[in-house]
């Protein structure tokens, strides 16, 4: 009987922890929607740099050619 009560209390406690964590996570998503969205970081939404623009690596240029930090 005591073990059953302890198990029930433990399950209720863990359920409450799960619900409060989920609620705070959802609130954080609403406060900072850009942190949860990976659309801006995906390759489909990234734009490439045109010729003459400042670059830092070859893959950021449309031509895939970055020399002396300038796209060619």
From Swiss-Prot:
Query: Which portions of the sequence form the region Disordered?
Result: 25-44
Q: Where in the cell is it found?
A: Secreted
* Signal is among the record's keywords: yes
Keywords assigned by UniProt?
Answer: Cleavage on pair of basic residues, Disulfide bond, Knottin, Neurotoxin, Secreted, Signal, Toxin
Q: Name one Pfam family in it.
A: Conotoxin
The molecular function terms in GO held by this entry are: ion channel inhibitor activity; toxin activity
UniProt propeptide residues: 23-45
Keyword Ion transport (UniProt): no
Residue pairs linked by disulfide bridges in the UniProt entry: 48-62, 55-66, 61-71
One cellular component (GO) term of this entry: extracellular region
Signal peptide range equals 1-22
Q: Where expressed (tissue)?
A: Expressed by the venom duct.
In which family does this protein belong, per the annotation? Belongs to the conotoxin O1 superfamily.
Q: What is this protein called?
A: Conotoxin VnMKLT2-021
Q: What lineage is on file?
A: Eukaryota, Metazoa, Spiralia, Lophotrochozoa, Mollusca
């Amino acid at each position: 009987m005591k073990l059953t009560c302890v198990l029930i209390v433990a399950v209720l406690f863990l359920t409450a922890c799960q619900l409060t964590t989920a609620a705070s996570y959802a609130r954080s998503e609403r406060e900072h929607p850009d942190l949860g969205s990976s659309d801006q970081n995906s390759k489909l939404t990234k734009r490439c740099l045109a010729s003459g623009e400042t670059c830092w690596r070859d893959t950021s240029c449309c031509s895939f050619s970055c020399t002396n930090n300038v796209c060619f």
